């Protein structure tokens, strides 16, 4: 459960991401594909090369979903319901992949926002991404 301090940290950190959200989302996806090659199996129709328009496009979708989650941090299950349905019933993404992408997002944010990425912010973002992952996998049951 996110504490009030966690929510404040997440909103502040995501605010610093600003107009780079899509770029950071794509970079996190590239990190995931390179670090965890089995995740590529969900994207057989994508050009997964560096800078690919498809990876950039999906990175923007990831970032937009996270922006939505930040904006609805007190009601993520409702805000992310359609996305949860999509990943559980149509795409059938293995839930472990959300943890892998979350890790890659944390690395990407730490690389781009070193001054803001304090231990407290790191912990808050980790809890937030775990909460998002939990919501996205809630309909698998």
Swiss-Prot record:
PANTHER family according to UniProt: HEMOGLOBIN FAMILY MEMBER, HEMOGLOBIN SUBUNIT ALPHA
Tissues in which the protein is found: Red blood cells.
Modified residues (Phosphothreonine): 8, 108, 134, 137
GO biological process: hydrogen peroxide catabolic process
Highest classification ranks of the organism: Eukaryota, Metazoa, Chordata, Craniata, Vertebrata
Name of the protein: Hemoglobin subunit alpha-1/2/3
GO CC term, one of those recorded: blood microparticle
Taxonomic superkingdom: Eukaryota
Residues bearing PTM Phosphoserine: 3, 35, 49, 102, 124, 131, 138
